[in-house]
Amino acid sequence: MSRSGTLTPFARGPGGYATALGPEPYLTVAGPDRVAGTHCSFPSSTIFALQPGGHPGIIAIGANGQARRFANLPGSPTGITADSTGRFGHMLLVTARQHAATAVLAIDCAGRVHPITTGAPAMEGGIAVAPASFGRYGGDLIAPNETSGRLYAVRPDGTVVTLAMSGLPHGGDIGVESAGFVPSGFGAGGAAYLADRYSPHNRHPGTNSILRLPGPELIKAGVHPGDLLVATEGSARTIVVHCARSCTVRYIAAGLATTHAEGHIAFTGQAG
């Protein structure tokens, strides 16, 4: 997608990417760093997408638009991100439902799966790794729980703690779902983006579009690089979380009442 909102087809040809309609195949892009305990790194410009359904896994989509199965997963995946700080060894991080609990998994550049914990509370959506500047949670995996409204921090040793209560409406298809950290160098020339998924017959049916919150509006709301933005699935009610010695939570924005937000909050970060 261009800055003007023009969409260009990608990975649509033979050998490209396709998945079933209905599930939530979140995606991420990994960095170029060497993965701990390996002799490899993730391929440049490769997208990694969750494959829900009967054979859960991760699909790798190369810059040439070709897709291949990259890893198998032991449970139903609910979120994916890449470790950019190195506290998780620069691996892919995935949350997956397993029976009554959630597993947090690290996947290396060879597609091997390493459990971090198999007893985490429910978490899903736009999970993200906190930058080192994010107080005592720097480098932790941050994940929302839509049913309770809690924001969790998962440490590399598998410990899970509550970072904050969102203070927003909570419940299935209502509560906190999407998260993203404002990048270094973010300024008036940047923006935040969030998918508004079409979900027919839902209380929040969505518009099958991409929402944009301009940089000047975020700056006016007191948002700074390194802050965490979190939005609810229903209506994209948005908070900013700032953590230093302690954490603060402020409400800053909302989408339309019909908005059905899903996935990561993504950014363009140029200063203006």
Report residues per predicted region.
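Sequence/structural signature of beta-propeller domains
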Residues: 1-272
